[in-house]
C-alpha cells in the first residue's frame, strides 16, 4: 500500500534521528524493500541513509560510508537539498568515528550547513553549527 512508504519512512527517519540501532535495523530494510519495489528514489535514499547510520552505529564503517554515499548521490540527482544536507551531516558524523578524519568531518559539516542555511532549515543548521563548534 502507498501509505506503507510513509509509515516506514517516518519510522526509519525517526530511528535515525534518535540513533536507535534496533529500530533502524527493523524499519530501514522494509523501507528499502518498498522503495526498490516501487522505484521511489526519494524513499530509497532515505532508506540508504538510515541503513548507513545503522551500520555506523553497529561498527560497520566501510559499509556505512558506502550507503551514505549512495544516498547522497540519489538526493543530488533528485535535487533534494534538505536530504542532501542531512546526508552530508551524517557523513560528517561518520568521519568523527575515524580519528584521522577530523578535517573531512569539518568539510562535510560545512557543506551541510551551507545547504541548511540556503533553505532556511534553522534547527538543522543550529545542530550543524554545534557539530562544527565541537571540532574546535
PLM regions: where:
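Helix-coil-helix junctions within alpha-helical repeat/solenoid scaffolds
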Residues: 1-136
